């Protein structure tokens, strides 16, 4: 029997995921097929307080059930649903709500700077809310491994609305002319229903860069500000840093100075990591900051400006300046320079690359390069020679920032700072940043085990998932707990993260790659010292986890079951 599963988004991401997983497994045993299209369903199971007023459910057998019972006894729950589901008739007055008057076919794109957690969590939230409204939906994830669940031209043509939940600039050319609403992954994840309502009301036709755009569309794009452009550059730079850092770590595994011997494997690994990947790091950062601002016309001057930042010694700070300068100059020329129609084709090929590259290049050589190089040299010297007290303070600040909003602007600002310092061979801050970023999900997992009676069944299962995400350095694993109880979760995590960051800096921990969590330990030399680093993570996790276990108020469901 084809069965539609509708889960109220207000029940929370963790509980919804748990129910979906358990009922899916039980459905296969009961020979039920869980589908997404309400038009093909023979039966609909609704988990929530009420059945949605949706004409798509008319005439179908519908069963309204409790999510706690579905999680605790999924097979029995499905058996009850099959036996007691009754034909449903939507109220006449409810045949024209937002879901009915709004779009029926929605395509969406999600993307975050690292392309790991927020990308997929936002996608799941959009899918859940859209299906709850009876909409057809498909979400394309622009993750770290490229586009997943790609939207086809036919699906774009049939779509009534495009939703883009992205913290970085993404290629949206295939959606030209379609009504589009843009938001962030954070809002799409935490305020899904409100964002979908706004999408229906505020979507405007999308015009790719280079074509005429309405003032509204242009102002919305600029409202994203410098932060989004910077994160776009960081997201493209990140794989380069990871690959280069791990190659350098493998080279060091043969001996700290083994790469100095020509013709050896250690020398080859150092050439790949330090001589190539790290050499391209700043140009890629600058190039894609400019790309985010001006689209393809900004890429060439951005890459050239980034390369000059390397050659002048101004490093990642110079690269950031070059990227923004190149992007805005290229955009200015593209939008303000008017040419006869016969010469318009020369703008993207000749005029924009030449003029913008000259302006950026001369500025980097004569105005920006040397002063910024002096600033970067001073910063690097201070970081490498600072005393223990300053190191502990810096580690505590960075650690606390990583736990403040778990994947939000403050978290990403600290992360971008650490990644940028890798270009100057300063590895201490990055070690503190990754260690602290692992604390929130690990602490929530620990709390659910220490104080099991204070958490309901779904939260206990969510704690197990958070432990795995924490080991992978995915701070967002703690978001379901923080969203439910922010006044207790966030202070506990910030204190634990600050402690971890402080210990990491105090022991002089170094991290060669900016991602991967504890699995980076599998690469010899990627983290040093290993034992001290583990102690730092464990200390912060214990403080945050035990503090939250003590402060946490018991859930009503958990108290009822204990009684």
Curated annotation (Swiss-Prot):
Cell compartments where the protein resides: Cell inner membrane
TM spans (from-to): 236-256, 274-294, 304-324, 349-369, 382-402, 430-450, 463-483, 489-509, 518-538
Membrane-topology descriptor: Multi-pass membrane protein
InterPro entries: Bacterial_PTS_Sugar_Transport (IPR050864), PTS_EIIB-like_sf (IPR036095), PTS_EIIB_2 (IPR013011), PTS_EIIB_2/3 (IPR003501), PTS_EIIC (IPR003352), PTS_EIIC_2 (IPR013014), PTS_IIB_fruc (IPR003353), PTS_IIC_fruc (IPR006327)
Domain PTS EIIB type-2: start-end pairs: 1-85, 104-201
Domain description: The PTS EIIB type-2 domain is phosphorylated by phospho-EIIA on a cysteinyl residue. Then, it transfers the phosphoryl group to the sugar substrate concomitantly with the sugar uptake processed by the PTS EIIC type-2 domain.
Pfam family name, one: PTS_EIIC
Name of the featured protein: PTS system fructose-specific EIIB'BC component
Species this chain originates from: Escherichia coli (strain K12)
Record-level GO cellular component terms: plasma membrane; transmembrane transporter complex
Biological process terms in GO annotation: fructose import across plasma membrane; phosphoenolpyruvate-dependent sugar phosphotransferase system
Origin superkingdom: Bacteria
Stored NCBIfam families: FRU (TIGR00829), PRK10712.1 (NF007984), PTS_IIC_fructo (TIGR01427)
Sorted UniProt keywords: Cell inner membrane, Cell membrane, Kinase, Membrane, Phosphoprotein, Phosphotransferase system, Repeat, Sugar transport, Transferase, Transmembrane, Transmembrane helix, Transport
Active site: residue positions: 112 (phosphocysteine intermediate)
PTS EIIC type-2 domain segment(s): 226-561
PANTHER family recorded: FRUCTOSE-LIKE PERMEASE (PTHR30505), PTS SYSTEM FRUCTOSE-SPECIFIC EIIB'BC COMPONENT (PTHR30505:SF32)
Function comment: The phosphoenolpyruvate-dependent sugar phosphotransferase system (sugar PTS), a major carbohydrate active transport system, catalyzes the phosphorylation of incoming sugar substrates concomitantly with their translocation across the cell membrane. The enzyme II FruAB PTS system is involved in fructose transport.
A molecular function GO annotation: carbohydrate:proton symporter activity
């Amino acid at each position: 029997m084809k069965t539609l599963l509708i889960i109220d988004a207000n029940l929370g991401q963790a509980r919804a995921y748990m129910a979906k997983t358990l009922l899916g497994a039980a459905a296969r045993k009961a020979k039920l097929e869980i589908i997404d299209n309400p038009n093909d369903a023979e039966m609909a199971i609704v988990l929530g307080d009420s059945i949605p007023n949706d004409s798509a459910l008319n005439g179908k057998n519908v069963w309204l059930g409790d999510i706690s019972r579905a999680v605790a006894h999924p097979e029995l729950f499905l058996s009850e649903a099959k036996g007691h589901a009754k034909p449903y008739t939507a109220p006449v007055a409810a045949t024209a709500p937002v879901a009915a008057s709004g779009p029926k076919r929605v395509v969406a794109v999600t993307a975050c700077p690292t392309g790991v957690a927020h990308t997929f969590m936002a996608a799941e939230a959009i899918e859940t809310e859209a299906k709850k409204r009876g909409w057809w939906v498909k979400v394309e994830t622009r993750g770290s491994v490229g586009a997943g669940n790609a939207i086809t031209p036919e699906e774009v043509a049939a779509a009534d609305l495009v939703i883009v939940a992205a913290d970085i600039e993404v290629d949206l050319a295939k959606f030209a002319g379609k009504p589009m609403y843009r938001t962030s992954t954070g809002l799409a994840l935490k305020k899904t229903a409100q964002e979908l309502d706004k999408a229906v009301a505020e979507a405007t036709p999308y015009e790719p860069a280079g074509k005429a755009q309405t003032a509204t569309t242009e102002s919305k794009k600029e409202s994203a500000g410098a932060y989004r452009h910077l994160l776009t550059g960081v997201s493209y730079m990140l794989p380069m840093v990871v690959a280069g850092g791990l190659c350098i770590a493998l080279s060091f595994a043969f001996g700290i100075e083994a790469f100095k011997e020509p013709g050896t494997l250690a020398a080859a690994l150092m050439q790949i990591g330090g001589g190539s990947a790290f050499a391209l790091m700043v140009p890629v950062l600058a190039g894609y900051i400019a790309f985010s601002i001006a689209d393809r016309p900004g890429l060439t001057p951005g890459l050239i400006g980034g390369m000059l930042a390397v050659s002048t010694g101004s490093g990642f700070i110079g690269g950031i300046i070059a990227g923004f300068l190149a992007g805005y100059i290229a955009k200015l020329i593209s939008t303000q320079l008017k040419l006869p129609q016969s010469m318009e084709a020369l703008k993207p090929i000749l005029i924009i690359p030449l003029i913008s590259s000259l302006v950026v290049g001369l500025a980097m050589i004569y105005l920006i390069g040397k002063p910024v190089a002096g600033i970067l040299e001073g910063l690097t010297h201070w970081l490498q020679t600072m005393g223990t007290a300053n190191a502990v303070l810096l580690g505590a600040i960075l650690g606390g920032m990583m736990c403040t909003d778990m994947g939000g602007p403050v978290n990403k600002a600290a992360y971008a700072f650490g990644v940028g310092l890798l270009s100057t061979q300063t590895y201490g801050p990055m070690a503190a940043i990754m260690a602290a970023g692992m604390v929130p999900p690990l602490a929530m997992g620990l709390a659910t085990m220490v104080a099991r009676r204070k958490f309901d069944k779904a939260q206990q299962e969510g704690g197990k998932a958070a432990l795995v995400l924490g080991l992978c350095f995915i701070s967002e694993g703690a978001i379901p707990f923080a969203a439910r109880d922010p006044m207790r979760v966030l202070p506990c995590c910030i204190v634990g993260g600050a402690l971890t960051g402080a210990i990491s800096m105090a022991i002089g921990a170094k991290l060669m790659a900016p991602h991967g969590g504890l699995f980076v330990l599998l690469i010899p030399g990627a983290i040093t010292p290993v034992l001290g680093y583990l102690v730092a993570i464990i200390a912060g996790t214990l403080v945050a986890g035990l503090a939250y276990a003590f402060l946490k108020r018991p859930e009503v469901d958990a108290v009822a079951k204990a009684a």
